[in-house]
């Protein structure tokens, strides 16, 4: 169980790091191509001076063990250098030509390139249903339009779950998971119209690789070795671990500088993230992309294909595009008016970034053997400010209140589903508030584009019926959709003491009304209902399809959600133990389950003086719930800060909404 909890904690923190913290550095610029492109002077001596100044200070700040950087320009490697160590214990220096790193999501652009090769050969039609290329595998589609390869390449599939499972990082050397088996077992469901919304989509990139494998009758990693790595002379690159790669692989380190044990992935041959490579090898790929698909005498892609890959293919707003075929755009402001796209990668122990500026034939790749590091994107920011310092300040419009009304509402991020953005008008101005930045004024710079107080853009999408239902703010990795206002519970009026908890959770689709339209706030909550509500908040993994471990929940309607909490390490099962799903949950039981969840997410401990009676096994959990004040008005705090949590009482439904509302805000 210890390994399960540790793995889950690493998984969640990595997901958040990639989806939020990593993206926070990419805050802003206009991605439209510059009307005139002046040549930029870039020479090895100047780049070396720049990197020698910037990288060591960022390594010190980040406690990063090592960094490799490579810059290409005009179809050649202009500069490459290693900093620090690939193994601190052995003092092995980083060598950009020899040190192998895990590239994580940068793998996706290589996979997309393989897809485009098959498009050139006529084996794939970008606008045809992908089921035609899946070798008999099928996907459930709740919409009227099929998923196409275009949707896979632009991450606009409409899939319900797009990220890997916690157990996809594992420590079993001989555990080989076949790509086809993984895809078949974990196929998501299409729940939004394909092509309508953008969500960073790991499964879409994995499906691309599976389709390449299926159409070529070759294991994915072998196709990539023969058709991508070999013509690009990428001799130190692979999608699967080999002894040759393992010998050269840098040791990955966590945030505290501790070495991360060697691990494998599921599937083993993972198109969306298992690639290993060196700085020099990646440089050859960037050269081909910037040279009309050609590296030396080898034509990796036709000129037209390479150009097509680099064009904007999905944009919620023309000034804030999201995807090319395989590459992504970062948030606009930091690009200083240049047309820049690239790809970031983050996996335990490694963080990386590649960016291309095609009009200047410049490409840069930065990688560090440090977990969840902002170093690569900070180097990007400094690079752009140093070599492309011009920034154009936007001119603001002056809309009236009537023009702003269509933007009001609560928007839910499609990937980070606990991230809610509240957009509202106050005194004639538009504001947005969320749990990351708080409340900020939005200034309009275009009919559907705004800038917040920190300089981040917020773009909205106007639908054919004239309504606004979607936006992207600082989390450029996903659209956020406007939630409909549900019909209020008949038995919860606006003055109800728990209305401020119940109504938001109702709108967030955690709570549902009964047949009479009531919530029954003072009724006791069952253990199964509590597990279901918490499962809805634990958004980052789907409900389980496996046989429940608890014998008494096998036919229960909430069995998949109870099993999910077990699989992610929140619930435990002893041999022969039952869950008692329909028994009322006590407040100390709810506190214990909730604290397991919050600990898994890395919540700090909080102390509290407890009054009343609490069982020994629940004291730690209740202290933390009380100490963090994750309670409703039923808990009264004394002047000295102590409180009676009423631990042994049954938890009422209204009380559970207070607890889970605060959990949602903190997770």
Residue spans for each PLM region:
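Alpha-helical scaffold elements that line and support the substrate/ligand-binding pocket
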Residues: 69-76, 102-130, 152, 185-186, ...
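Catalytic loop of the DD-peptidase/beta-lactamase superfamily, centered on the K-T-G motif
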Residues: 35-81, 216, 225, 230, ...
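Active-site-proximal loop and beta-strand segments within enzyme catalytic domains
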Residues: 45, 61, 83-202, 216-218, ...
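Feature responds to low-complexity, polar/acidic, surface-exposed segments characteristic
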Residues: 12, 30-35, 166, 480-497, ...
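Bacterial N-terminal signal peptides that target proteins for export
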Residues: 5-19
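Flexible glycine/proline-enriched surface loops and loop-helix/loop-strand junctions
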Residues: 94-98, 189-194, 205-206, 262-272, ...
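Hydrophobic core
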Residues: 20-26
């Amino acid at each position: 169980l210890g390994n399960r909890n540790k793995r889950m904690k690493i998984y969640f923190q990595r997901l958040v790091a990639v989806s939020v913290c990593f993206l926070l550095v990419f805050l802003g610029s206009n991605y439209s191509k510059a009307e005139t492109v002046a040549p930029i002077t870039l020479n090895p001596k100047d780049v070396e001076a720049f990197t020698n100044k910037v990288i060591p200070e960022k390594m010190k700040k980040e406690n990063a063990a090592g960094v490799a950087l490579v810059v290409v320009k005009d179809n050649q490697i202009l500069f490459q250098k290693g900093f620090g160590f690939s193994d601190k214990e052995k003092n092995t220096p980083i060598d950009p030509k020899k040190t192998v790193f895990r590239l994580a999501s940068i793998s996706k652009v290589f996979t997309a390139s393989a897809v485009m090769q098959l498009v050139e050969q006529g084996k794939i039609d970008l606008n045809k249903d992908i089921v035609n290329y899946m070798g008999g595998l099928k996907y459930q589609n709740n919409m009227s339009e099929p998923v196409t390869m275009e949707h896979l390449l632009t991450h606009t599939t409409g899939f319900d779950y797009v990220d890997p499972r916690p157990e996809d990082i594992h420590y079993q050397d001989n555990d080989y998971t076949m790509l086809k088996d993984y895809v078949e077992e974990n196929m998501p469901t299409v729940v939004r119209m394909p092509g309508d919304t953008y969500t960073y989509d790991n499964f879409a990139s994995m499906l691309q690789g599976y389709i390449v494998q299926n159409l070529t009758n070759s294991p994915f990693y072998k196709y990539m070795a023969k058709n991508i790595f070999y013509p690009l002379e990428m001799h130190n690159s692979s999608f699967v671990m080999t002894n040759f790669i393992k010998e050269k692989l840098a040791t990955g380190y966590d945030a505290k500088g501790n070495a991360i044990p060697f691990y494998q992935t599921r599937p083993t041959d993972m198109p969306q993230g298992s690639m290993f490579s060196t700085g020099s090898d990646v440089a050859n790929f960037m050269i081909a992309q910037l040279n009309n698909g050609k590296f030396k005498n080898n034509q990796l892609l036709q000129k037209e294909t390479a150009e097509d890959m680099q064009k904007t293919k999905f944009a919620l707003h023309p000034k804030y595009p999201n995807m090319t075929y395989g590459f992504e755009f970062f948030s606009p402001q930091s690009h200083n008016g240049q047309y820049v796209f690239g790809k970031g990668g983050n996996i335990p122990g490694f963080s990386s970034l590649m960016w291309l500026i095609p009009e200047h034939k410049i490409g840069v790749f930065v990688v560090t053997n440090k977990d969840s590091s902002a170093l690569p994107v900070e180097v990007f920011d400094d690079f752009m400010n140093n070599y492309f310092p011009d920034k154009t300040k936007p001119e603001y419009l002056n809309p009236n209140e009537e023009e702003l009304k269509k933007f009001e509402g609560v928007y839910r991020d499609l990937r980070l589903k606990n991230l809610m953005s509240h957009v509202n008008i106050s005194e004639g101005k538009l504001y947005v508030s969320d749990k990351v930045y708080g409340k900020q004024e939005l200034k309009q710079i275009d009919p559907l584009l705004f800038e917040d107080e920190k300089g981040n853009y917020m773009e909205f999408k106007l639908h054919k019926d004239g309504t606004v239902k979607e936006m992207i703010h600082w989390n450029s990795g996903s659209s956020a959709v406007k939630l409909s206002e549900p019909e209020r519970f008949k038995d919860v009026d606006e003055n109800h003491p728990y209305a401020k908890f119940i109504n938001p959770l109702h709108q967030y689709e955690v709570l549902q009304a009964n047949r009479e339209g009531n919530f029954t706030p003072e009724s006791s909550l069952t253990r199964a209902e509590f597990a279901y509500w918490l499962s809805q908040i634990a958004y980052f993994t789907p409900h389980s399809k496996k046989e429940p471990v608890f014998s008494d929940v096998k036919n229960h309607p909430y069995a998949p959600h109870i099993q999910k909490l077990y699989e992610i390490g929140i619930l435990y099962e002893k041999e022969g133990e039952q869950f008692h799903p329909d028994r009322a949950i006590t407040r100390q039981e709810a506190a214990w389950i909730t604290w397991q969840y919050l600990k898994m997410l890395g919540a700090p401990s909080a102390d509290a003086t407890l009054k009343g009676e609490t069982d020994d096994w629940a004291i730690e959990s209740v202290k933390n719930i009380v100490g963090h004040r994750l309670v409703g008005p039923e808990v009264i705090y004394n002047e000295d800060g102590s409180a009676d949590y009423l631990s042994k009482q049954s938890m009422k439904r209204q009380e559970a909404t207070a607890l889970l509302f605060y959990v949602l805000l903190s997770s």
